[in-house]
Amino acid sequence: MDRDSLRQYRYFLKDSIRKKVDFSQTDQNRGIDVPPIEKPYRNDALRIDLVKPGDWKNIAKIDLATAIGNRQSRRVYRKTPLNLEEVSFLLWATQGVRGKIVGGHTYRTVPSAGCRHALETYLAVLNVEGIASGIYRYLPLSNQLLYEFPEEQLASKMVDAVFGQPYPGNAALTFIWTAIPYRMEWRYGLSAHRVIAIDAGHVCQNLYLACEAIGAGTCAIGAYDQEAMDRLIRVDGEEEFAVYLASVGRV
């Protein structure tokens, strides 16, 4: 192994960079406007209203210790589809907004460094009742699902983009989290990137626990073809790019 490269990548896991950042020179402290907390979309884009918290009828109240104890990666799924209420619950559990939007930030169901929430949530939908197959994006501010575009042979393209791992092709849907790094860089400069990765872990763990309440399973996916995945969801790979995935299906 290349020891110099190992040291370089291990350095990323440390917080030593924070002592080298001149925070007086970050864009926030230079008075540059805060970046949007949600990626923009066209006004005429198709949006699906999700079921609001408090209106769920069939989401089980499961003991937290039970959910934690049963949590595991599940790669084999039944053909039974998920429904809109269940998808609404999973999206709320992983990126839902709690309370009011204050001062350009949102309090959500997951923690984020400095409340910056640099992640966007895409869904590759294959088997959800009443929702056409295709690529969607969660809009946490309005609690809606934005229809991005249809995609032919989506199941096989998802499998190809994760180096042949089969379970995204058999799942009801796959969560694809992207990072928009500038949301975090605006405040933290060069110390932003490690905490974006940490934030992704918070989100995915909530998905694991939430799946236990709806009779579903999930499997986190950290191995994927970066360029192929970015092309599939049509992000530029520079200002926004995929950082984490998780397939979800009925078990």
Label every PLM stretch briefly.
Residues 90, 121, 171, 175-184, ...:
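Small-aliphatic-rich amphipathic alpha-helix that forms the alpha element of a beta-alpha
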Residues 1-174, 181, 224-251:
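N-terminal accessory segments that position/regulate proteins before the catalytic core
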